[in-house]
Amino acid sequence: MSLSSLTLDSNPRFAVGGPYHRRYPPLHHPRSFVSCSAKRPAVSASLSVAADSAATESLGRIGSLSQVSGVLGCQWGDEGKGKLVDILAQHFDIVARCQGGANAGHTIYNSEGKKFALHLVPSGILNEDTTCVIGNGVVVHLPGLFKEIDGLESNGVSCKGRILVSDRAHLLFDFHQEVDGLRESELAKSFIGTTKRGIGPAYSSKVIRNGIRVGDLRHMDTLPQKLDLLLSDAAARFQGFKYTPEMLREEVEAYKRYADRLEPYITDTVHFINDSISQKKKVLVEGGQATMLDIDFGTYPFVTSSSPSAGGICTGLGIAPSVVGDLIGVVKAYTTRVGSGPFPTENLGTGGDLLRLAGQEFGTTTGRPRRCGWLDIVALKFSCQINGFASLNLTKLDVLSDLNEIQLGVAYKRSDGTPVKSFPGDLRLLEELHVEYEVLPGWKSDISSVRNYSDLPKAAQQYVERIEELVGVPIHYIGIGPGRDALIYK
């Protein structure tokens, strides 16, 4: 079965409730049928002119962004934030991570098309003039960080003097990852589906105030006592975790070596960023995960342990709310989720499988297959409300190119037909509600070489503009492929 066969099913298998459908008025234009090909067509003179026009448009769009801007995820992660950050980084002096840890997987491509999968290092690293900051709100796994740096250096990407790690950032140890797995086993039926990268336990250590910070590595005389407290606490909490004196000795010796290597990177990043702002330097904040995984606003407890929404920028970098300007929300043209938790527009049938294959929806961090479904407008409106986005980046529009019809989840209703006005915090309600869908026509043509919005098929434009109309936020960037150049500026 091909993606083109993905049309309305008279009895589709959706994750929750039963869908209602209403058809959006069809387009009155002849539809062109062009077979999609993995090969990029030869660039013609007209395409060259289009590329020049797109370049001019992009400079104007990016140049108008605020001194301190941010790129945040609108859904449950994996929206393609890294690509936009990589593109925008060329116009910013600093790119900063403010929260999360190695559970964030950002995939970017250099000008030669080489793929880089980053987890801790900000996506601006491929731009040689950009300074990359790992802020105080991030939890840092040093073996993982050094592995990323070594991988970048071996591929010709210079990191020396370009990566700054906050002295206030908390360290994530290997035992945090072990404890993360034990915690998931304890949860049994309420399995959250974490990446098991130790993020939750590391933030837990931070909150109960026995965590160890990057700056503590400058005082190796007190590290053994602090590590002993951390490891003893974990052993008392988890029966499956065995703590021995030998483990402590090995960790101390390892972190003595790490401390020496990390020293050139350690910085008071709060001072650095605020001083840079006062010098009129431009700062781009790169969010990890996404709003619907926020510890406060997400589908709790099926969330991450930090704040990937706008509020996390200030607390994770130590900057005032008044200096934060334009925030760009990144949203897929459909919806995906990794791990457990409510997913109102999830398609559990063949349609979800086909979207997964067409979009290559497998996690950057875990490799797990992502759950797939239609774009959830209710969740997107909630995300826009929480963050106050100035604009949106709609990604992976090309994945939908082979569909006859496309659905938008536009409203929620209770089982008795009562409307649900906003994305609810009540998990039981989320499990039981029904989704109302609008059905729009597909465009059935390859859009991967399009670079001007006006050259998109009318049905594709209608899809984009209907999303804008429903959420009330303009879409300024449209992704139509993985490469740097596969972006339309609207």
Curated annotation (Swiss-Prot):
Signal peptide: none annotated. Mg(2+) binds at residues 78, 105. GO terms for cellular component: apoplast; chloroplast; chloroplast stroma; plastid. CDD domains: AdSS. The modification N-acetylserine is found at residue 46. It is found in: Plastid, Chloroplast. The keyword Transmembrane helix does not apply. One of its GO terms (biological process) is 'de novo' AMP biosynthetic process. IMP binds at residues 78-81, 103-106, 195, 209, 289, 304, 368. The active site is at 78 (proton acceptor), 106 (proton donor). It catalyses: IMP + L-aspartate + GTP = N(6)-(1,2-dicarboxyethyl)-AMP + GDP + phosphate + 2 H(+). Substrate binds at residues 364-370. Belongs to the adenylosuccinate synthetase family. This is Adenylosuccinate synthetase, chloroplastic. It comes from Arabidopsis thaliana.
